[in-house]
UniProtKB/Swiss-Prot annotation:
HAMAP family: Ribosomal_uL24_A (MF_01326_A). Part of the 50S ribosomal subunit. CDD domains: KOW_RPL26 (cd06089). InterPro entries: KOW, Rib_uL2_dom2, Ribosomal_uL24_euk/arc, Ribosomal_uL24_KOW, Translation_prot_SH3-like_sf. Coiled coil: none annotated. One of two assembly initiator proteins, it binds directly to the 5'-end of the 23S rRNA, where it nucleates assembly of the 50S subunit. The lineage of its organism: Archaea, Methanobacteriati, Methanobacteriota, Stenosarchaea group, Halobacteria. The keyword Magnesium does not apply. GO terms for molecular function: rRNA binding; structural constituent of ribosome. Belongs to the universal ribosomal protein uL24 family. Residues 10-22 have a biased composition (Basic and acidic residues). GO terms for cellular component: large ribosomal subunit. Keywords: Ribonucleoprotein, Ribosomal protein, RNA-binding, rRNA-binding. This is Large ribosomal subunit protein uL24.
Length: 120
């Protein structure tokens, strides 16, 4: 394992997609943290998040897309205007948001969260 910063950055940037999933994790709200017994969770499309940092701090919305290649998420109503006046989604780092509501339509995800809760 290298300690050189440029190699660390390259390794993160060039990671395989199944490893990049670790880069799109966000902290849970205190209520969800108490309920599920874990501190953070991978962000999925459909989750409701609150932006904690940056120009949009305090905004809440549903996650529209998760871009694993860029390790970014796009949140509903968090947009920026282009030079020609078009509204485009503003990419956010997952670490700068807090998950306030989980989308539990995926049975596997729900089972995983429940098993984590049981382990504590």
């Amino acid at each position: 394992m290298t300690r050189q910063p440029h190699k660390q950055r390259n390794r993160q940037e060039r990671a395989a997609l199944h490893e990049k999933q670790k880069q799109v994790r966000a902290p849970l709200s205190p209520e969800l943290r108490e309920e599920y017994g874990q501190r953070n969770v991978r962000v999925n499309a459909g989750d409701t998040v609150e932006v904690q940092r940056g120009d949009f701090a305090g905004e809440s919305g549903e996650v529209v897309t998760v871009d694993l290649r860029a390790a970014e998420i796009h949140v509903e109503d968090v947009t920026q205007e282009t030079a020609d006046g078009e509204e485009v989604p503003r990419p956010l780092e997952a670490s700068n948001v807090q998950v306030t509501e989980l989308d539990l339509e995926d049975e596997v995800r729900e089972a995983r969260l429940e098993s984590e809760e049981d382990n504590e």
